[in-house]
Amino acid sequence: MRSIMENLIKNNPTIAIVAGEVSGDILGGGLIKALKVKYPQARFVGIAGKNMLAESCESLVDIEEIAVMGLVEILKHLPRLLKIRSDIVQKLSALKPDIFIGIDSPEFNLYVEDRLKAQGIKTIHYVSPSVWAWRQNRIYKIAKATNLVLAFLPFEKAFYDRFNVPCRFIGHTMADAIPLNPNRTEACKMLNIDENQRYVAILAGSRGSEVEFLAEPFLQTAQLLKRKYPDLKFLVPLVNEKRRRQFEQVKAKVAPELDLILLDGHGRQAMIAAQATLLASGTAALECMLCKSPMVVGYRMKAATYWLAKRLVKTAYISLPNLLADEMLVPEMIQDECTPEKLVEKLSVYLDETESAVQNRQVLIQRFTELHQLIQCDADSQAAQAVADLLEGKVNG
């Protein structure tokens, strides 16, 4: 009887997947596609966006219902979110899937994982929360709720290993999407800009609070750079219309005369086209490394937030390239260090045309390439294999 059940699971599993936002849905779509190669008859059910729906995942709830961002929005919708979370647990408990995969959204998914695991359902958390950086005691909650964590980055797995929590490093989907040698000519063509021109890309962040604190020093940096290097032009990708309006308002006050090329999105192409990039910390810094653009990371926040972060954050670096390299590969100019003068000083290392500057740039790009290779592992397939191994009892969580 047991072998009949095992064969049934192996050939025809029910796989529950919950994505809490657009980025999770993209990962979910790639994962389902890879899982279908292994399990053509599998049933996929959970909370899905357009990418997962395109791969025939049944969605029990519209993803828009839970895709809320920011503390104020979350508090505003908290009763509804808690009800949806309880309903999902109830529905999946009745369905009894062979495995549950929660993609990111830890506040939502770890609760679901904990409840389902207690019923004997195997659970995976895909995308590690930043437990290695702050609130490290969350590791115990993760250990209780999951059979396996899928991590994008090798230092994340090393952290879980320290606590004997099952974790598999699968590489990063972004490293799979960006070629090792990005095509600058193609990027310039896509942006409709002259490839013979020198550019600096400026990315002041995707959140309103980031643009609020960074737009002014970044614009002042561009003013100083223009005086020092008159041939430079500036590419400014903005994630949406709201951020564009916010940035334009700051520019009108701080640097009305400054000539900028404002872009709707196209951050990746801007970084590939640029001689150097000035950006906020976050996933953009990893993307910039993969685009092989020498960068300076700048970050400012409220004084109270910075005071708290200094006490909570346990890592030596804040940017992903430096965390990956485990060294100060790119400058991090935080809070009082994030001044136009200091940002210009650091960017000049990449923009000067001396022999040593050219050599430094080449060495940095080589290191970026090595780190790219480290995390370019075909993450979708690696994630699917990890799911299959747990599903078929080849690993124990």
Swiss-Prot record:
It comes from Mannheimia succiniciproducens (strain KCTC 0769BP / MBEL55E). PANTHER family: LIPID-A-DISACCHARIDE SYNTHASE, LIPID-A-DISACCHARIDE SYNTHASE, MITOCHONDRIAL-RELATED. GO terms for molecular function: lipid-A-disaccharide synthase activity; phospholipid binding. Its EC number is 2.4.1.182. Keywords: Glycosyltransferase, Lipid A biosynthesis, Lipid biosynthesis, Lipid metabolism, Transferase. It holds the Pfam family LpxB. GO terms for cellular component: membrane. This is Lipid-A-disaccharide synthase. The lineage of its organism: Bacteria, Pseudomonadati, Pseudomonadota, Gammaproteobacteria, Pasteurellales.
